[in-house]
Each structure stands twice: as C-alpha cells, then as structure tokens.
Amino acid sequence: MKKNIHPQYNVISASCSCGNVIHVRSTLKHNINLDVCDACHPFYTGTQRIIDTRGRVNLFNKRFNKNNKNPFI
C-alpha cells in the first residue's frame, strides 16, 4: 500500500450565526462560518418562520388564492 496518500484531518471550528460552535474533523485548514445549525434550524427546533423575500409569499398567495375570482390575474 502507498504511504502518505490520504489528506491530513484537522480539527476545525464551525461557528454558527446563532453563536453555537461545533468542533469537527475536516481536511480544511481553516475555520468555517455557518448560517444555520441544529441549534437554530427551524426543522430541529420545531419552530417555523416564513422569510418573505421581496413580497414573493404575498404575491404567491394573491395569485393562487382559492377565493380569488380570476386565478389568472
């Protein structure tokens, strides 16, 4: 078997925007920043949030509302 062909595993810190820090082993040589983690992700916390990007949720609800008389407007 060949020697020294596998990358070196380093212990890095993955810092979340909520403040949670996770220490993981990786082939990266620097720490990384995360947007969400298991401590703040809505799926794991049981809370749901709707992030409205430029009114797109309202536009979707307006177009596909079942009570709307003309669904093509």
UniProtKB/Swiss-Prot annotation:
Coiled-coil boundaries: none
The keyword RNA-binding belongs to this UniProt entry's keyword annotation: yes
Cofactor binding summary note: Binds 1 zinc ion per subunit.
GO molecular function: metal ion binding; rRNA binding; structural constituent of ribosome
GO biological process, one term: translation
Residues annotated to bind Zn(2+): C16, C18, C37, C40
Superkingdom as given in the UniProt entry: Bacteria
Keywords: Metal-binding, Ribonucleoprotein, Ribosomal protein, RNA-binding, rRNA-binding, Zinc
Cross-referenced HAMAP family: Ribosomal_bL31_1 (MF_00501)
Role summary: Binds the 23S rRNA.
Family: Belongs to the bacterial ribosomal protein bL31 family. Type A subfamily.
Record's subunit section: Part of the 50S ribosomal subunit.
Protein name from the UniProt record: Large ribosomal subunit protein bL31
